[in-house]
């Protein structure tokens, strides 16, 4: 993982954000890699902001800018992710697995706008790409916004996205989960 430049935007492993554990803003240079690593009992939702990322498990999918990949680790897997020729900037969002006994799976949603199907009832993800001068109204929830020169994470009650860029909103069942008590 020595190619990785990572900034942790949010950690909530105490259950205060329901199933959401962490959001990381990751950057890899062209051909850079996370290195082979394991996951178990976690769902990783990767939102590619720029560049591309090849997933080294399953079908070896390439996830491009604007795509959302959902990795359900379930019973566990080892994998690697490698940046394409243009490098990659990706928001990696980690959620406690909705079904830790399920076999691992991986799917890619190509360029979604609006709600992304995550296959779980305790977390919903809304995605938009806001162009300069465009007005987009986001739903209430935890807003993650990548503007021209910053990434912000803030709880908001819904309304206009404040600046151009990639916007995500997490709606989470924040009732304190049994594992956090």
Model-assigned labels for residue ranges:
Residues 1-181:
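Jelly-roll (double-stranded beta-helix
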């Amino acid at each position: 993982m020595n190619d990785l430049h990572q900034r942790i935007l949010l950690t909530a492993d105490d259950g205060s954000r329901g199933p959401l554990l962490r959001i990381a803003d990751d950057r890899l240079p062209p051909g850079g890699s996370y290195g082979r690593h394991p996951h178990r009992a976690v769902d990783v939702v990767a939102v590619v902001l720029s560049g591309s990322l090849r997933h080294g498990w399953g079908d070896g999918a390439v996830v491009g800018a604007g795509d959302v990949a959902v990795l359900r680790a379930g019973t566990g897997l080892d994998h690697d992710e490698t940046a394409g020729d243009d490098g990659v900037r990706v928001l990696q969002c980690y959620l406690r697995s909705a079904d830790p006994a399920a076999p691992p799976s991986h799917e890619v949603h190509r360029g979604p706008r609006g709600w992304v199907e995550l296959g779980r009832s305790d977390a919903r993800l809304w995605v938009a790409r806001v162009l300069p001068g465009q007005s987009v109204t986001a739903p209430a929830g935890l807003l993650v916004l990548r503007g021209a020169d910053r990434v912000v994470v803030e709880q908001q009650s819904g309304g206009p996205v404040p600046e151009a860029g990639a916007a995500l909103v997490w709606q989470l069942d924040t009732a304190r989960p049994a594992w956090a008590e």
